[in-house]
Amino acid sequence: MFGAMLRYLIGISFFADSRFPWATLTINLLGSFLLAWLTSYVFKKVRLSPHLSTAIGTGFVGSFTTFSTLSVETISLFQDGHNFLAMVYVLVSLLGGLTMSHLGFKVSKEVQKS
């Protein structure tokens, strides 16, 4: 619930007037980094119960990010004739999400070394 509210606030605060779904893209990329970093560093450093870790990871971060909105926005771009933008959006979302997850794991390893 809190993740979804934060997603909504970011969307209306920074990207309200954009035709391109910058809000969802930004949120999903941040969420990919955050979930990787939380699971590979924070949850190992801070002793939390498995239930609380799951609540934070899949509850907060899961509701912050959104695959369903990405899907609907992609279809809307296609329906509005923005085929190239739709394909770029999907590719950047997928490759960017994987890159940000990788970066989250990498940052975690670097922080653990120091």
Swiss-Prot record:
Q: Reaction catalysed?
A: fluoride(in) = fluoride(out)
Describe the task this protein carries out.
Answer: Fluoride-specific ion channel. Important for reducing fluoride concentration in the cell, thus reducing its toxicity.
**What GO cellular component term, any one, is given?**
plasma membrane
Annotated control of activity: Na(+) is not transported, but it plays an essential structural role and its presence is essential for fluoride channel function.
Q: Membrane spanning segments where?
A: 23-43, 52-72, 84-104
What is the top-level taxon of the source organism? Bacteria
User: Is the Zinc-finger keyword given for this protein?
Assistant: no
Cite the binding residues for Na(+).
Answer: G62, T65
Family membership: Belongs to the fluoride channel Fluc/FEX (TC 1.A.43) family.
- What gene does the UniProt entry assign to this protein? fluC1
Q: Which PANTHER family does the entry link to?
A: FLUORIDE EXPORT PROTEIN 1-RELATED
A Pfam family annotated for this chain is CRCB
Q: How does it sit in the membrane?
A: Multi-pass membrane protein
- Keywords assigned by UniProt, alphabetized: Cell membrane, Ion channel, Ion transport, Membrane, Metal-binding, Sodium, Transmembrane, Transmembrane helix, Transport
* Keyword Membrane appears in the UniProt entry: yes
- GO molecular function: any one? fluoride channel activity
Instruction: Report the protein name in the record.
Output: Fluoride-specific ion channel FluC 1
Q: Where in the cell is it found?
A: Cell membrane
Listed GO biological process terms:
cellular detoxification of fluoride
The organism is Desulfitobacterium hafniense (strain Y51)
